[in-house]
Amino acid sequence: MKFRLTAVIVLALCLSNAFADEGMWLLGNLKKNKQTDRVMRELGLQMPVNKLYNPKKPCLADAVVSFGGFCSGVVVSEDGLVFTNHHCGFSSIQQHSSVEHDYLKDGFVARSLEEELPNPELYVRFLLRTENVTKRVLSAAKHAKTESERRVAVDSVMNVIGMEVSEKDSTLTGIVDAYYAGNEFWLSVYRDYNDVRLVFAPPSSVGKFGWDTDNWMWPRHTGDFSVFRIYANTQNGPADYSPDNVPYHPEYVAPVSLEGYKEGSFCMTLGYPGSTERYLSSYGIEEMMIYSYNNRF
């Protein structure tokens, strides 16, 4: 099935050559899934599950952002530094480039807060909480007589639930998404920060090494990262760009470790995937094999 960039997912696996176990889960379901908790601990997870995601207390998920609505990012400092991929920051880097200052070719570094470059159309989105609204959505469609009527009813109530969030608090955004082929519906509540400034980008020869040819063909050796900073008003709240804004102070930070990892280390990723076929039905897999893969090969 397809996921929009609106819900944080967790992927866990063990890097050991001898054994690997993996999966993809909605964060809201993690606490309920005792087997997932047990398996991750067996693989080496030391952090309690409620430290991964907790809508009532600061947690690791608070450091993970939807970057621009099309990528993932992670907050790594108390002053709002965000790491994301080079290709995710590519358009912002390009926007500030010129013949005199070709930041795509040569890279960019801001040596002070004053040198950081604003990006008017860029934002980062923090997930505040998720809520299962399946019963409410499906009840709105129970009297539908056709699939078309059902779709209209479902879409309508999804939009209503989302709008209710911003009506209660204008700084919040509510989005309802369908999961598991429309058998579950989850509301995600976000807060957006619209003042995001470019801090550092490597040259494209590093950040885009191999370009998309290598991306889809080979293991990559790419410095695929860029660094931005979130700015807020003096109350640490969302604000449009202003010279008076100050660096955002996050509720939770994922600090960078210089110790690295070793073979067999537990590995887990939180983020906003563009799409996944992990929960595709057997009929969907059959369709891909017959009509998609056969035509390609």
Locate the predicted segments by residue.
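Terminal presequence/propeptide segments associated with secretion/organelle targeting
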Residues: 17-297
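Bacterial Sec-dependent N-terminal signal peptides
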Residues: 1-22
